[in-house]
UniProtKB/Swiss-Prot annotation:
Belongs to the TrpA family. The active site is at 54 (proton acceptor), 65 (proton acceptor). Its EC number is 4.2.1.20. It holds the Pfam family Trp_syntA. It catalyses: (1S,2R)-1-C-(indol-3-yl)glycerol 3-phosphate + L-serine = D-glyceraldehyde 3-phosphate + L-tryptophan + H2O. Pathway: Amino-acid biosynthesis; L-tryptophan biosynthesis; L-tryptophan from chorismate: step 5/5. Keywords: Amino-acid biosynthesis, Aromatic amino acid biosynthesis, Lyase, Tryptophan biosynthesis. Tetramer of two alpha and two beta chains. The gene is trpA. The lineage of its organism: Bacteria, Bacillati, Cyanobacteriota, Cyanophyceae, Synechococcales. It comes from Synechococcus sp. (strain CC9902). The alpha subunit is responsible for the aldol cleavage of indoleglycerol phosphate to indole and glyceraldehyde 3-phosphate. This is Tryptophan synthase alpha chain. GO terms for cellular component: cytosol. The keyword Amino-acid biosynthesis applies.
Length: 269
């Protein structure tokens, strides 16, 4: 791939910008409750208006995740979910799933396979990007060109505690979009969001042309509207969706996920 401009993630953001809309980006844990349900949920989210999806690869020590997503990862691992099986499931949806899928994985599983092989396998399965929350910037700068060769955007994270100089460097290095963590700490729902994030959205947009998506702590319609009012290009909703899915009966998980996504979609437009 010659540049990030031609990536499916970049193209989706460009389309949304022309339409004056914000990207809705749900997160779900692959394999919770099992991979066949995950496949159904991905298609349900697409039908309900999700612009792209973050797909978590379950890991036993998820440092960035709060209790809801940790529990989802534990359920997925108990069900026998492995990175290989996640990619096989994703590959089986080629031809049906047209929205970009961004894999959310910790560095340990990625490094166990090897950066180059992992990126090859992810691209072959149809992924469009990667988020590796515990990967230091220096390692990310090594991984990014490897990912880009396979047509994958390596999305980097910025937190409210990130020093200003480093924030600019991260925004310049991120591909697809910059993932702005809206709160300090782990993922999870929040009733209010740190107002400082609004200033960070604008600072990031000034330091790099790459879109800015806000995640961690977005629990529903009100937060999605708030993020949109700040001028963010995308809103990532994880724990609230995972919790909604966990409380649904097995046969209605995909329908519940789609219903919640539809509610959020209206707020993002």
């Amino acid at each position: 791939m010659s540049s990030q401009q031609s990536s499916s993630i970049a193209l989706r953001f460009e389309q949304l910008k022309r339409e004056g809309r914000m990207a809705l980006m749900p997160f779900l844990m692959a394999g919770d409750p099992d991979l066949s349900v995950t496949a159904e949920v991905l298609l349900s989210l697409q039908a309900a208006g999700a612009d792209m999806v973050e797909l978590g690869m379950p890991y036993s020590d998820p440092l960035a995740d709060g209790p809801v997503i940790q529990a989802a990862a534990a359920r997925a691992l108990a069900a026998g979910t492995t990175p290989k099986k996640v990619l096989e499931m994703l590959s089986s949806l080629r031809g049906q799933l047209s929205i970009p899928v961004i894999l959310f994985t910790y560095s340990n599983p990625l490094l166990n396979v090897g950066m180059e092989r992992f990126c090859e396998q992810a691209a072959e399965a149809g992924a469009s990007g990667l988020v590796v929350p515990d990967l230091p910037l220096e390692e990310a700068e090594r991984l990014s060109p490897i990912a880009e060769r396979e047509g994958l955007d390596l999305v980097l994270l910025v937190a409210p505690t990130t020093p200003t100089e480093r924030m600019g460097r991260i925004a310049q290095s991120s591909r697809g979009f910059t993932y702005l963590v809206s709160v300090t700490g782990v993922t999870g729902e929040r009733s209010t969001m740190e107002t400082r994030v609004e200033g960070l959205v604008q600072a990031l947009k000034q330091s790099s042309p790459v879109p800015v998506a806000v995640g961690f702590g977005i629990s529903g319609v009100d937060q999605v509207r708030q993020v949109r009012s700040w001028g963010a290009d995308g809103a990532i909703v994880g724990s609230a969706l995972v919790k909604r899915m966990a409380s649904a009966s097995l046969g209605s998980v995909a329908a519940e996920a789609g219903l919640f996504c539809s509610e959020l979609r209206k707020a993002a437009d």
